[in-house]
Amino acid sequence: MAGHSKWANIKHKKAAADAKRGKIWTRLIKEIQVAARLGGGDANSNPRLRLAVDKAADANMPKDNVKRAIDRGVGGADGANYEEIRYEGYGIGGAAIIVDTLTDNRTRTVAEVRHAFSKFGGNMGTDGSVAFMFDHVGQFLFAPGTSEDALMEAALEAGANDVNTNDDGSIEVLCDWQEFSKVKDALEAGGFKAELAEVTMKPQNEIEFTGEDAVKMQKLLDALENLDDVQDVYTNAVVIEE
């Protein structure tokens, strides 16, 4: 993608995630509990649980922690009171932001999300105000130097919808979000290990921010990410570090 390095952004994202591993584990435990409660404790027949368990493995969460979270979810001891709520809003320059939460107190969560938006130059929107600007997809990113032809053949055979080579040489593979685990398994069986593999809300268009605007936007995104009830934050803003 012209103007910025998607590969650099992904490396930054991974480094930031590693720095917040304890917080990531907390979020994953909540997601595993809710997924198990809603769809049962067998990851083979529960796609949402499979995704959460795979994420836990990628985050190096001990298997005992995962099993306990599944057991609690199935048993209803925890997770039963968590409610999924999506908030939508805008950052500076009209950048679109989606905030997905799991909460046991809707009043607390909406107040915290609204406060973060307003404190850092954004504002809350109504349901559906920005979600149409994103596609719910499975996304894989492979390092520069990966064989494009071989990856494209394997990806399309696995059921992927699109394979794109970015300006920095990294390769992006997209699939229907429901097919994510199947495509991931097939690619790994073919020897292709993605640096990033996730189900995400991918923006249809991106807005680049530099300088002071980039700093402001990053502060807003960090404030939202750091809220305890927040599971994921998606945006069409691309923060360019100078």
Curated annotation (Swiss-Prot):
Read off the Pfam families from this record: TACO1_YebC_N, Transcrip_reg
Compartments where found: Cytoplasm
Q: Which UniProt keywords apply?
A: Cytoplasm, DNA-binding, Transcription, Transcription regulation
Q: Does the keyword Transcription regulation apply?
A: yes
Q: What is its main location?
A: cytoplasm
Q: Name one GO cellular component term.
A: cytosol
Tell me the InterPro entries matching this sequence: Integrase-like_N, TACO1_YebC-like_2nd/3rd_dom, TACO1_YebC_N, Transcrip_reg_TACO1-like, Transcrip_reg_TACO1-like_dom3, YebC-like
* Top-level taxon of origin: Bacteria
Which BP terms from GO are recorded? regulation of DNA-templated transcription
Q: Does the keyword Cell wall biogenesis/degradation apply?
A: no
Under Gene Ontology molecular function, one entry of this record is:
DNA binding
Q: Which SUPFAM superfamilies match?
A: YebC-like (SSF75625)
Give the protein family: Belongs to the TACO1 family.
In its UniProt entry, what is this protein called? Answer: Probable transcriptional regulatory protein BTH_I1015
